[in-house]
Amino acid sequence: MQRADLRNVAIVAHVDHGKTTLVDAMLRQSGAFGAHQLLTDRVMDSMDLEREKGITILAKNTAVRHGDLTINIIDTPGHADFGGEVERGLTMVDGVLLLVDASEGPLPQTRFVLRKTLEAHLPVILVINKIDRADARPVEVVDAVYELFIDLGADESQIEFPIVYTNAREGRAALDAESVGESPDLKVLFDLLVERIPAPTYEEGHPFQALVTNLDASPYVGRLALCRIRNGRVKKGDSVAWCRHDGTIQRVRLSELYVTEALDRVDAPPEGAGPGDIIAVAGIPEIMIGDTLADADDPQPLPVITIDEPSLGMTLGVNTSPIAGRDGKKLTARLIKSRLDAELIGNVSIRVLTTDRPDTWEVQGRGELALAILVEIMRREGFELTVGKPQVITKEIGGKLHEPMERVSVDIPEDYLGVVTQLLSMRKGSMESMTNHGTGWCRMDWLVPSRGLIGFRTEFLTETRGTGQLHHVFDSYHPWLGELRTRPNGSMVSDRSGPTTGYALTNLQERGAMFLGPGIEVYEGMIVGENARSEDMDVNPTKEKKLTNMRTSSSDHTIPLVPPRQLSLEQALEFIREDECVEVTPATVRMRKVLLSAQDRGRKRGATKALV
């Protein structure tokens, strides 16, 4: 049976191709908001971090009306680091809008989200967005998408997809690229969506079944479980069977039942919700993602969602620096552990493992960005942390050590072709293909070890003067490629505590790039700059000028201080080596040696050489 009055669709794309902007336009044109309402751009991006970085981190759903139909739209992240959100989003829908930039074309993350879509056997509508760009090339982009479908092993029915061209920012859509400017609205897209995305199917008379795909919390009713109803009906106050991961089944009562209208959760109608509806239920405090809610008298669990394995890990623990506790309020191991446990409840793509230290844990995820976002969120919540260098997660396959490889796509001006090729070759990358668009820009596709990309972005942007674009996504596990040295320069390490002085920094800036200005409190073992040479250098950034009562024939020369290079959290995590870590507080991000004392570091170096 089908529910003709409902459609469930996910919007998937590479990061920053305009998914959230398109949802904004669909909400406005469906009458979801009153004409008097003032809306921010990207209303679906509700987290501060999402607005700051211009990316979607969490999968969210909204509902719009089109005539007599309700269309549930899932806005998924375009970044593979948040792939767990993409996979969960796809379990809730019957079709997909694949959004591709009219100029950039399909990129590695497009490949990632499309692969997930094809594995789920979902029909696709191709949306070529940003058609108003001066460098738009819709014909070539459509051809590239066809090639991507074939490359990913799509069958004939999947390759026969309809195409619509849009300008999401202005809310226009048309069936050919030239007509987009004349189109008044997105009606073409809405009509195509209703026509080509199948209505939810269900079995008549089948007992109630719903799979929990996400969790949320309300200050009034506690934990909310978000699920899509597969079969049957349910209403507020019903008793249902809660089928857990471990196979146990418990009878529970649904204290609240909500459905989505535009961006708001509202009480479900008195008759409840039926097959295909995306609902939020309250009344089960310990429910987890992947659990099934089923008929109390005939419980039939649904298959659990499979999530890709994490490929990167880093240690995260209590702040152990000499000046810990000055900025944050949450300092203890107990608070950090309870926060990580809370993160595990809603974030299925990370794992938390114990280490040999009781105040430190290993957090594993899909990539640097996902892990850095978690640390940034905790920092804003008042935590102080010590964060280790991100390390790849290796596997034993057939008795041999294997490491994760990433598919890398770079768009660069032709002038930087040589230097970027050299950078990626040094990191044991192998070039797969190179395309010259004839516009002075070229695109290269590489296969590079994940560990070779740690710290690569900053160097890449420096060498291309900020013009290059870099995108990468996990590909597969390959045999270990041997030793890899990624950072050629050493660190400048403070050899004592105290405030930095302009006099000391003036002398030190000749030796390398400084990370701090004058008047900043430092401690022994803290990294204050990047050495121009390959080895580490212990320095005194607190040195003051000696004053005498002797007059000299020449006055002091004024040497201007170069402004310090201030690193963000992501840049700091990329910069550090294995024997270094990042100190994170609500106010600052500092880098330091794991062993603060110069004597301890010297002893360890001596012991390492003796072993060799």
For the regions a protein language model found, what residue spans apply to each?
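Structural and coupling elements of P-loop NTPases
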Residues: 1-612
